[in-house]
Amino acid sequence: MAYKIAVIPGDGVGPEVISEGRKVLDAVSEVENFEIEWREFPHGAEHYLKTGELLGEETLKEIERCDAIYFGSIGDPRVPTGVLEQGILLTLRFYFDQFVNLRPVKLFEGVPTPLAGKRPEDIDFCVVRENTEDFYVGAGGRVKLANASKQKAAKGAAGAGKGVERQVLEIKRSLYQLKFGLEIEGDADEIAYQIGVLSRKGCERVIRFAFEFARARRRSGGGGGAGEGEERERSQGQGQEQGRSRKKVTSVDKANVLTHAYGFWREIFSEIAKEYPEIETEFAFVDAVAMWFVKNPENFDVVVTPNMFGDILTDLGAMIQGGLGLAPGANINPEGVSMFEPIHGSAPKYAGKGIANPIATIWAGSLMLEQLGERKAAEIVLKAISEVLRERKVLTPDLGGSSKTSDVGDEIAKKVKAS
């Protein structure tokens, strides 16, 4: 079997950690007798600064011919915040409709956690984050009402003292296209606003994914990859110790304050939960969950949440599992091209020093193998990661070691080849 993988190393430490990920994946492909054809794309800060190009339609079509995307990191202080994120990372998520962001939160043996008294069996759950809607749809703006008021006064118009601004916002997704016509009137000098959107289908599909994921996770004793139907059940083996019997989905929102959007989310969650009577369910507000992640992480199995809350909570999850260098993410379209990445940023101050932890990227590669149906290969990689962490002989500085990025990649690849 041969797989074509689009590689976008990106910025900062991205190329360094991606290099180690490729090293390990190439090693396991030899062990398991499949081929990986890497198709590298230069898109990131350097490419943007030289060419002004982000991700165009032609490049996206080329990536679409690949089986998956292996992504490093994005972000550079020379480029205004949001340009690369919107033009590359979010473009990939939205173009390929990667509506699930799956993030395992797992403490490995040998890795210290800031949570006193918590053991690996206590920190082992997955967050399923809706990945294409909520406040990340890109609908918003800024309005200087004071300027509009002055213009009206200069013209002697009625209602001088209040500014009026008209704006049109458009949202285009695979599920829908929306257009908002806004007329803003007031005496404030300047305002900014952001619109969050949840659709019924968008909520249904990610919530149903979470329930199917919880069901398959319990059957296999784990959970970390994703597919559809039998393929999903077959390909989920990471993130849970064998023998644990919890089967629970926790819905996280803020429906007590943001009643329209998240009350809608709760309603849909309740409807879908009825289809899975064997799975325990609970509702929780996001502020409470932030506390419980720290106080009682053992109470969680599968957490499903809208986009913004998931973005925030999974960084907290990363810290309780040992840090961002150990936290992978999968952006999944079960029927299309999915993308796999570490959740850490580009960390430009560490770029070129050879000290970035590549384990999150290597683990993301394991998740990619699961998604591709190479479950045994995925398990081999995860086992090698686990052994390196347990032995604590070859670790980067963030985990108390003195090894280089490449040393960690070499050690994991060596264990893969010896499996």
Task: For the regions a language model picked out, list residue spans one by one.
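Active-site rim loops that border cofactor/substrate pockets in soluble metabolic enzymes
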Residues: 40-48, 257-303, 311
